[in-house]
Amino acid sequence: MAKNIQAIRGMNDYLPGETALWQRIEGSLKQVLGSYGYSEIRLPIVEQTPLFKRAIGEVTDVVEKEMYTFEDRNGDSLTLRPEGTAGCVRAGIEHGLLYNQEQRLWYVGPMFRHERPQKGRYRQFHQIGAEVFGLQGPDIDAELIMLTARWWRELGISDHVSLELNSIGSLEARANYRDALVAYLEQFTDKLDEDSKRRMYTNPLRVLDSKNPDVQALLNDAPALGDYLDEESKAHFAGLCALLDDAGIRYTVNQRLVRGLDYYNRTVFEWVTTSLGSQGTVCAGGRYDGLVEQLGGRATPGVGFAMGLERLVLLVQAVNPEFKADPVVDIYLVASGTDTQSAAMRLAEQVRDALPGVKLMTNHGGGNFKKQFARADKWGARIALVVGESEIADGNVVVKDLRSGEQTTVTQESVAAHLRTLLG
């Protein structure tokens, strides 16, 4: 017997019992994005490798260790996208969407990173992200954060996430800080772990993000990034904090928050949780005013964020179990008797025409009433429509509320209006 082929490690199937909750969560997220004026953009999952090397940075963990890169049959180097911002910027430049224009875009889809699979961290994962181009003030940064805060309220998880905020300043200010940080770290090379030693010269700001408690202890006396900010970045950050204060959004300034991608400047933020163990980051983003020009476009400010859906689903399940998937079926149509199936299917189409948002499933495969009602219960139906030979002959249908057990007989012409009342 042939050996079963299984999914690749870290790339998961999501079965019907799981996707219903995903759909409800995604629907809520998309509704909020629409209410803020964002439009969807759909992007390829494969891009030219140089796009990510130029955007993310050649000495980042993502580019050095985590990308799925391969040569196609023409010898071109291609990469499965590890994040969404670079592709969104590439598309904006290619299609003339950015220069001297304001754009508010969102995307959703799979991303790929070769990491060690664990709960909340996978090799294929799904992100929803939003990007704003053409606006450089702190007000749009604040509105993006307010949008994410609305997401948490909609999902009932506001009490389980907290906002961390920082400014990493301009490229010039960050270069000055980098020199000061390296000079400080060089005094303690014997106390740094191997990863921090490597990062000290390739991407020293990433040492600030070390998970090693000994390294974090060393950093207590390190130069503070905030002391090296340029005046414009200080004013921008002060404006952002004032807007968040006015909106009642609580935050913590974390001067070690730097993000792992090279394109950020000024604002960086993360929403974090303590409810998912070590995988604490739920949503993260920041400002990238130089990225469009870096990728070949004209200078255009940008700011955005991305959120991993797998981690969000886990968080909702952990802290708000009352947020449940919508039922697969609202109405189940039960038919019994000789030559009733055709009439039942016509009735089902009539109801779907009149109530286009309603999920109606028609029984197929026969079975007595008991078996058909068991199927209705399995699918979570609230209402059963019952037609037999006598109902068809009289032009009627029995409507049964499966929760209360109450049932009534109505004409087929009035069944849609009756259902509309029952379903609210």
From Swiss-Prot:
Its EC number is 6.1.1.21. Keywords: Aminoacyl-tRNA synthetase, ATP-binding, Cytoplasm, Ligase, Nucleotide-binding, Protein biosynthesis. GO terms for cellular component: cytoplasm. Disulfide bonds: none annotated. InterPro entries: aa-tRNA-synth_II, aa-tRNA-synth_II/BPL/LPL, Anticodon-bd, Anticodon-bd_dom_sf, His-tRNA-ligase, HisRS-like_core, HisRS/HisZ, HisRS_anticodon. CDD domains: HisRS-like_core, HisRS_anticodon. GO terms for molecular function: ATP binding; histidine-tRNA ligase activity. It catalyses: tRNA(His) + L-histidine + ATP = L-histidyl-tRNA(His) + AMP + diphosphate + H(+). The keyword rRNA processing does not apply. It is an enzyme of class 6 (ligase). One of its GO terms (biological process) is histidyl-tRNA aminoacylation. Gene3D superfamilies: Anticodon-binding domain (3.40.50.800), Bira Bifunctional Protein, Domain 2 (3.30.930.10). SUPFAM superfamilies: Class II aaRS ABD-related (SSF52954), Class II aaRS and biotin synthetases (SSF55681). Homodimer. Belongs to the class-II aminoacyl-tRNA synthetase family. HAMAP family: His_tRNA_synth. This is Histidine--tRNA ligase. It comes from Klebsiella pneumoniae (strain 342).
